[in-house]
Design a protein with these regions (language model features):
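NAD(P)-dependent Rossmann-like dehydrogenase/reductase catalytic/cofactor-binding core
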Residues: 188-300
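Anion (oxyanion) recognition and catalysis
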Residues: 5, 26, 69, 144, ...
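Active-site-proximal catalytic alpha-helix in oxidoreductases
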Residues: 133-188, 194-212
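Rossmann-like NAD(P)-binding element
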Residues: 16-17, 26-84, 92-107
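Small-residue helix-packing motif on alpha-helices
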Residues: 22, 42, 58, 193-197
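Short, surface-exposed connector motifs at secondary-structure boundaries
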Residues: 2-10, 44-48, 121
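NAD(P)+-binding Rossmann beta1-loop-alpha1 motif at the extreme N-terminus of oxidoreductases
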Residues: 1-31
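Rossmann-fold dinucleotide-binding core
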Residues: 76-168
């Protein structure tokens, strides 16, 4: 919203009054009654409604939001979840509005930071419904407005399939699994926590990943030591072949809506927060990430 505002768009914010998000909006310079309103009032006033709640929040708020989606308005998503899995979310927009998507490939924090620096994140865009005939022009303008470095076209379905696969795969799930496996093996073989962490995580995140981001993995392979090069060339296909079936199972689970069912059912449980904290504590209290906390303190 700040990026759009700074790019000259007429933006109003809808938040629950007296919530942390409301207070943050005020801290960010939004003014109550001028460009900061409660959710229903903002939806009534807005011509393009950016529906940016969490997936669970979107399901909960949909009956409230839907009544303000009058003819000719635009409903904007940053994720294809609610629309793609409409049988489970019950998010079914009226037929006389535009429905579009811009999905930045990173967090809102990163998007804002890069925008302030004069840079941007890559984003996908999609059109689900074009009632007015202006959906394409609007989605591209909004994609640029939110701070996209470049835009590539997709569909709501492909966006959510790739996004859920990525989150459970190389972005978070798989990478944590690889980190944990290598760290545990090194510790089992007698390496110190510091050595195991540095060789597993610290060197990757602080040295190699930035170079890969800048130049590509092909460049990394061509510009490392001969020992590292030979080993990486010999082993990468073994890792690919080992995890390929896991990724096939993962994509099938996403495609069939199983991951959506699990997510929705988990969020609906009365003890979800308590159960979630136990799972997060398992990570927080694991030796690898306790060691990581200490290693980060030693960075220059």
């Amino acid at each position: 919203s700040l990026n759009l505002k700074d790019n000259g768009f007429n933006v109003i914010i809808g938040q629950r009054k007296n919530s942390r998000s409301w207070d943050k909006a005020i801290d960010d310079g939004w003014i109550e009654g001028e460009n900061l309103f409660e959710i229903e009032e903002a939806c009534k006033r807005g011509s393009i409604i950016q529906y940016l709640l969490s997936d669970a929040g979107q399901i909960q708020m949909w009956p409230t939001i839907k009544k303000y989606l009058t003819k000719g308005k635009t409903l904007y998503f940053s994720h294809g979840f609610g629309i793609t899995y409409k049988e489970q979310t019950n998010i079914i927009p009226p037929s006389d509005i535009d429905v579009i998507l811009v999905a930045p490939k990173g967090s809102g924090t990163s998007l804002r930071r890069l925008f302030v620096e004069g840079n941007g994140l890559n984003s996908s865009f999609a059109i689900y419904q074009d009632h007015t005939g202006n959906a394409r022009d609007n989605v591209i303008a909004l994609g640029i407005g939110v701070g996209s470095g470049y835009l590539f076209e997709t569909t709501f379905k492909k966006e959510v399939y790739s996004d859920l696969t990525g989150e459970r795969g190389t972005l978070m799930g798989a990478i944590q699994g690889l980190f944990a496996a290598q760290y545990d093996i090194l510790r089992k073989k007698g390496h110190s926590p510091s050595e195991a962490f540095n060789e597993t995580v610290e060197e990757a995140t602080q040295s190699l990943y930035p170079l890969i981001a800048e130049n590509g993995m092909d460049w990394m392979y061509a510009n490392c030591s001969t020992t590292a090069q030979r080993g990486a060339l010999d082993w990468w296909k073994k890792f690919r072949d080992a995890v390929y079936p896991v990724f096939e199972d993962l994509y099938d689970s996403v495609e069939k809506g199983e991951e959506t069912r699990i997510t929705i059912e988990a969020n609906q449980k009365s003890d979800y927060r308590e159960s979630l904290e136990k799972e997060l504590d398992e990570l927080r209290e694991s030796e690898i990430w306790k060691t990581g906390k200490e290693v980060r303190k030693l960075r220059p």
